[in-house]
């Protein structure tokens, strides 16, 4: 009887593997539910811990490009992770370079991949504030950011974004943000954007860049920024990190 159960599991897993590249929901189901839990069980480590080990083994300390390359290689060839990824990462790079922000905010640090991508492009004296709700993710991110040699450019703050955003002016001396990268809980995109507005943290010309607007999707956020006359928005089509599933980034300029 046991062999029958094992055979069914193998068949189901094989089907998921075949479909994960073409179906967004199946891709996320496979990567975030099945594959991740199997690896957690067999390695005794969490996914962020495995990513950190890959960085420490394959990247050059103090070299952000090698850290990015090590994570991309690991996530494309060994284990998927919810980083912005190499394809969308190039779009992120181009927007950050175009904006050349003096003040930058990231919502959702995770392991620090996009933090490293953004921070390495910032001008001297510019700091990136990145918010992370999960303390375990934050602990790994700090190590990866330090390994990249960017700890002096990054302020990582732990806690719920809804609690931390109103404290930006008082605790960090921020008048407004030139650039905001949204890559945290998708149901927080609209509330946190409104909170940034209410707290006066967006100025005329501030740029918001939102990830995963197609997969898993942020329909309410897209409706908000595309229909509000205070925003000028553009969609950048791409793929869900390390897959062939369609995803994209939404760039929205706040017009005041």
From Swiss-Prot:
Top-rank taxon, per record: Eukaryota
UniProt protein name: Catechol O-methyltransferase A
Listed EC numbers: 2.1.1.6
Compartments, record wording: Secreted
PANTHER family in UniProt: CATECHOL O-METHYLTRANSFERASE, CATECHOL O-METHYLTRANSFERASE 1-RELATED
PROSITE patterns assigned to the protein according to its UniProt record, in alphabetical order: SAM_OMT_I
Cofactor note: Binds 1 Mg(2+) ion per subunit.
Molecular function terms, GO-annotated: catechol O-methyltransferase activity; magnesium ion binding
Any one GO cellular component localisation term in the record: extracellular region
Signal peptide positions (record): 1-27
Positions bound to Mg(2+): 183, 211-212
Binding site for S-adenosyl-L-methionine: 84, 114, 132, 183
Source organism of this protein record: Danio rerio (Zebrafish)
Broad class of where this protein is predominantly found: secreted
Catalytically driven reaction(s): a catechol + S-adenosyl-L-methionine = a guaiacol + S-adenosyl-L-homocysteine + H(+)
Cofactor: Mg(2+)
Residues that coordinate or bind substrate: 186, 212, 241
Residues that carry a glycan: 58
UniProt entry keywords in alphabetical sequence: Catecholamine metabolism, Glycoprotein, Magnesium, Metal-binding, Methyltransferase, Neurotransmitter degradation, S-adenosyl-L-methionine, Secreted, Signal, Transferase
Described function: Catalyzes the O-methylation, and thereby the inactivation, of catecholamine neurotransmitters and catechol hormones. Shows highest activity towards catecholestrogens and dobutamine. Also has lower activity towards L-DOPA, dopamine and epinephrine. Active towards the xenobiotic compounds methyl-DOPA, carbidopa, isoproterenol, and apomorphine.
pH-linked activity: Optimum pH is 7.5-10.5. Active from pH 5.5-11.5.
Family assignment from sequence similarity: Belongs to the class I-like SAM-binding methyltransferase superfamily. Cation-dependent O-methyltransferase family.
Tissue: Widely expressed. Has higher expression in females compared to males. Strongly expressed in liver and diencephalon. Expressed at lower levels in hindbrain, spinal cord, eye, telencephalon, spleen, gut, gill and muscle. Detected in ovary and testis. In eye, detected in all layers of the retina with highest expression in the inner nuclear layer. In gut, expressed in the lamina propria but has little or no expression in gut epithelium.
Biological process annotations from GO: catecholamine catabolic process; developmental process; dopamine metabolic process; methylation
Listed CDD domains: AdoMet_MTases
